[in-house]
Swiss-Prot record:
GO annotation, biological process: amino acid biosynthetic process; aromatic amino acid family biosynthetic process; chorismate biosynthetic process
PANTHER family on file: PHOSPHO-2-DEHYDRO-3-DEOXYHEPTONATE ALDOLASE, PHOSPHO-2-DEHYDRO-3-DEOXYHEPTONATE ALDOLASE 1, 2
Entry's Gene Ontology molecular function annotations: 3-deoxy-7-phosphoheptulonate synthase activity
Keywords: Amino-acid biosynthesis, Aromatic amino acid biosynthesis, Transferase
Species of origin: Streptomyces lividans
Gene3D superfamilies, A to Z: Aldolase class I
Pathway: Metabolic intermediate biosynthesis; chorismate biosynthesis; chorismate from D-erythrose 4-phosphate and phosphoenolpyruvate: step 1/7
Name of the featured protein: Phospho-2-dehydro-3-deoxyheptonate aldolase
SUPFAM superfamilies, per the entry: Aldolase (SSF51569)
Annotated family: Belongs to the class-II DAHP synthase family.
Amino acid sequence: LQYIERLDPEREPGRLTFIVRMGADKIRDKLPELVERSPPPATVAWITDPMHGNTYEAAPVHKTRRFDDVLDEVKGFFEVHKSLGTHPGGIHVELTGDDVTECVGGGDEIFVDDLHQRYETACDPRLNRSQSLDLAFLVAEMYRDQ
C-alpha cells in the first residue's frame, strides 16, 4: 500500500489493480485490512489469484494444487468484499482446455496418485477443462449473489 501515492497520486479510477495471492488459509484474515487501508474502492480493481498461494509439492516430481483450496480462496475473496461493501474485480487462474492431471480434486476426482497420468505443464499446475468449468460456474453464482 505504500506505493499507492507514487503510482496513482491523482487517484484515477481503474489505474491500480491489486492482485492478491494469499492462500485459502489466509485470505479471510489478511484481505480485509488491505481493502480497508486502500484508497476508496472505486479507484482500485481487486483481483484474486487463488492458484499460487495454494501450490504444494505432492511428490518429488509434481507441484500441484487442491481444487477445493482454490475454490475456498475464491469464496473467501468474495466473502470479504461482500462484508466490506466493495467489489470483487475478478480472478486470475491458470487453466487449460485439455484433460490434464495437474491439480487434484474437482468433479473428476483427480487424486495425487493420478498426477503422473497427464502432468504436462512446463511450469505451474493448471486446472483442467472440467475443473475450469466447475470453477467458472461457481464464480458466476458468487457474482450473482454479490
